């Protein structure tokens, strides 16, 4: 799991990972969750991959920097986390080269796609006929406090016959808990 950079009180930069991700790795994967620094100057990916059985690229608020998929940055699409971008890109490719499973959730899925040449739409709010995936808010404008509301099913997905996921999920339809999706190409 790669840390997500954020500012704490006093302006100090910190890295964190969501409790839901830690619990999923521990209980569902029966594995020991480890936080990987989203800082390329202190992250030794080769050494890390000698001791892990898999990698989870988690979600995060910052967007993948558009320079990775041939689009110009724009202030309305910020924030970006170029340090995490650099670590995730190198880590994703190294996992594939070594045959180590690397699963992506939310931004992590976007990082995997971009690492292998796909592009993203920089902001799905700009797309016609989009589905709104943002975090539910209270009437006051504050983020909804209950995770079962924030991560509730949002829409259905129908897999095409022969889709790769059918062999793993054993279903052709399901409702993911997605909040944003910008993949294209």
Can you name each region flagged by the protein language model?
Residues 1-103, 114, 118-121, 125-170, ...:
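N-terminal beta1-alpha1 cap of cysteine-dependent amidohydrolase-like domains
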